[in-house]
């Protein structure tokens, strides 16, 4: 990592802001649009601090390059849980002072970590275009059945959320996925299952791509983030979600070590953690709030379409953060080598 070129460092610093501005980096798309409405603009109105929003695709190498070279230009960063755990262990993120953020007891279990605060609960689900399929799939096993359901499949270009899906398609129960994946035989089994589908896969890297591929007909079904599909449904597109075998987790706010605006970053995270602001976020994208006090503020019909609804979460898989922190690097390397063949 430390051998990264100055060009990479320059690239990661391209989304900089003027002195005094707060740079917040997210995964973009409908998620960022919801954050702008719920957090960015209201925070600026409340504090006078301008929020400059940037985007990335989760490349921790960029964060490490900035921290190692002491050229940090990002103040607040949206990260997935495995990257939060690994980045915290490796000293890439600041430890958070919860006396300046809020009561840990107000958050759903697992959302208040030493280096990060949960923004929302999301799920990677099976989504399909109901205009293309007269009868929809019922789970990941059907995802692999290209005879019964002809057409391309969209899948995330990475080991995470893809190896789990492969095992469930091969008959592994949701509750046993990580137990199996923690063994060499389980990993081999997942890749063998992916081999079967590889000719029919169209890879996606950004969360905005699956709904685009589904609407255009490039794929007939895809793994996808539930909130992105829900937003496309709001636009009148006939996309459907299968919750069985969905993988749910948090995205969290973290502060890169050496942020030039640490105090303002903490104030922003505290602001974004308030129930009234999380309510606005969930109203704009179908992700569950991490502050439990936000749930009673939401319409009951909306709550039923969130990953946190009991009927949706009961057949899902909680993403095993410790597993991906321990094995993520080696599995991603193997996946990249496999995908390149």
Residue ranges and their predicted role:
Residues 13-19:
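Sec/Tat signal peptide C-region and signal peptidase I cleavage site
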Residues 20-87:
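Early extracytoplasmic/lumenal segment of secretory-pathway proteins
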Residues 29-36, 72-74, 78-211, 215:
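Extracytoplasmic ligand-binding site segments that recognize negatively charged/polar headgroups
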Residues 84-86, 221-238:
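A ligand-binding cleft/hinge motif common to bilobed small-molecule-binding domains
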Residues 106, 122-124, 187-196, 233-259:
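Periplasmic-binding protein-like
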Residues 125-132, 167-169, 250-261, 280, ...:
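A bilobed periplasmic-binding-protein/Venus flytrap-type ligand-binding module shared by bacterial periplasmic
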Residues 212, 312-341:
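Conserved C-terminal helix/tail region of periplasmic/extracytoplasmic solute-binding proteins
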Residues 256-316:
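Mature extracytoplasmic/periplasmic domains
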